[in-house]
Amino acid sequence: MRHLLAPAVAVSFLLALSPVLATSARDNKSAATATASRGARGTKARVQAPKAAPRAQAAHRLTIDDLVEIRHPSNPVWSRDSRHVAFMWERAGVANLYVVPADGSRRPAAVTTDGAPVAGVFWGAESRVIYFTRAGVLMQVAADGSQPPRPVWTQAPGRAATASRDGTRVAYLLGGAQPASQEGRGGRGQGGATPPQAGGPTEIRVRSLVDGSDRSVVTFDGPVTALSWTGDGEHLTFTSGGTPGRIVRHDQTPAYSGAKIIYTITENVAGTPGQSYIVAATGGAATAYNAGPAAGFGGRGGANRWIDRSHFLVDRTVDFKRRQIYVGDTSGAEPKLVHEDVKDKFWSMTGGAQGGSQASPDGRWISFLSDRDGWDHLYLMPAAGGNPVQVTRGRFEAWRPTWSPDGRRIAFDSNEGPSPGSRHIGLATISGDLTHVNVTMVTSGRGTNTAPVWSPDGKRLLYQHTDPLRSADLWVLDVTTPSVTPLQLTDSMPPAIDRAALVEPRLVHYPGPDGTPVPAYLFVPKGLDRSTKHPAIVWIHGDGVNQNYDGWHIERNYAVYYSFHQYLLQRGYVVIAPDYRGSIGYGSAWREGVYMDVGGKDFRDAALSANYLKTLPYVDSSRIGVWGLSYGGFFTLLAVTEMPTTFRAAVDVAGVADYAMYYEDPYHGGWTVSRIGTPEENPRVYAQASPVSHVDRLVRPLLVLHGTADVNVPYLHSVRLLDALLKQGKGSLVQFMTYPGEFHYFTREHVLRDAWTRVSAFFDENLKK
């Protein structure tokens, strides 16, 4: 499960192994151009499906080796001359930095090869050098790969480096208190957080990346945090004073885990806010200002938080029911509330929507997303003051808005159309004022197109595309020439995968517990003999607030499961993937249907997909399995305890065993309270959301997989589950695999190989005999 709250508790074995990740030496594939039609809203344009290469022999059957080789691109960054794109390309938990020409003339080339972490990527002013941070150190590497990465500083390296908008300078800190290490909170989840290190005065400095000159800006006693540039690139803001957060470690042996296992409970203790300051980047006295209410909603940081030199945006949520937007003023005036959304249930828009307020680059407009009409839509309002204007309308979601460099257009992605699991890129163009905003869709056809990124010259959009026949890749679209087709820049699927053998999903609906239609994606193996009965599997997605897509999932952490389902399909399984109550893509009423009912109708929505499968003449109703990750694992545990004979076998991957236990974890308490209050307020809901309390009902085989370094759903949930199962004499029905050092979303190659092999064998053993 995934939340907007800052991580507060990490749980791991005290003796968890630190994995050694090996890099892959797989050759790059050449970039391919796929044809696509473009047009205004309503035209019958489509992205053509890739053609399978001619084969002289029988089609290749998917293997686990093939699944491991699928790569996943992320975090693309345009060069400042709009000619190249840098991005991360991950294979089995190992990611390196690549560069590809935006015209697709050459295949992507790696500029890092060691798989070491890369963060904060930005291009130098002349687009010949790429900068990034590694272990807090600012690094530089030649964009053409002619020179290996090296530190920018050779002596006394600075920390917390942040680049100016034009890429010519970096501001950084020297001395002062070192922040607490946050290792173990990221994707690899390795643990090992360290306490903050004491220090004296903190100096803010600015270094030129053009000539190497370096100047002191200001020095403050005590720690300095939140260093950033203002939108004009001429000033810096930062916070000083207050009480820095700290990390407290506890060794704990819960009573239900026996006497010989010691767990480390890592608690992130929040600090108190400090004073915000602004200072000229050339140096001088720093001026204190009121930074506004504590932020809590997913607004973007950086330049688009600044309206002009003096005014900035602050978003926050209040009691999980109100989302507010303020305009702050560095001159000392009190922040002004300019917009508020108030919910009866809870603010359910996810961070993935990127719906926070943004200022247009020219400072004229403020954009944000709101679901005030029941759907997540784009709104604009004048930065100088005035009422918001709704830009997109309809029964669809418009997400991830981003301003063009000239401030006249906003690109976004939406699932407008017949399939809620497809998304396309739209453009909102402002002609003079907000009474003249024209919206057009610039991609169409089957597939999921998300996360548009403008080129600095404003002529092209980079975005991610997936569809039923290909996993996520980066594509680029020229928005100045309607006749030009999108260009594919990466090809992340290994050549061994036969796309012609892949199964395309079909959107179906079936009645939920209250009769409301539940959407789901049905996968039927190609060439299936429908005159006989076959086993089937229900896949329950995680997060609660997520969804299935019309093809590969847009997120790597769920795309690997879509890949594995294609593997299961080629082994003869029918698969169904429901979008139960709480899922995104269907409006706020569906998303908020879990309010005060977690583990109630939402669980029934998912579990009743088995009834739909039983209506299919080619599915054996006695051989249906169920599995899920995280929130889906929680539903799986409910399925085997609330509906113990419906499913022949079940696989729980890092599922929540008890919501009262989940509530007690500071990392998850707020998320839980927003949906179901506290255990004291709603004991009935917490009782229904506690599958560990009913494991005496288990009568069918259960496989449990969990990583010890999981902070999203602490590993202790599975330990408590196993303890309860053993005490009820259910040990013969349970298989339990621990992955030392693994995070919530399985990433490392040896873990993926073991998990997929184990799940496949488990289903074969229990559903095919």
Say what each PLM segment does.
Residues 101-104, 142-146, 209-212, 280-284, ...:
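Short loop/turn segments that connect beta-strands within beta-propeller blades
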Residues 54-71:
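A short helix->beta-strand "capping" segment at the edge of beta-propeller domains
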Residues 303, 309, 441-444, 448-769:
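Serine-hydrolase catalytic core recognition
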Residues 94-98, 137-139, 180-182, 199-203, ...:
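Structural motif
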Residues 137-139, 143-207, 211-228, 245-247, ...:
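Asp-box/WD-like beta-propeller blade repeats and closely related beta-sheet repeat scaffolds
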Residues 70-88, 113-133, 155-179, 215-241, ...:
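Conserved beta-propeller blade repeats
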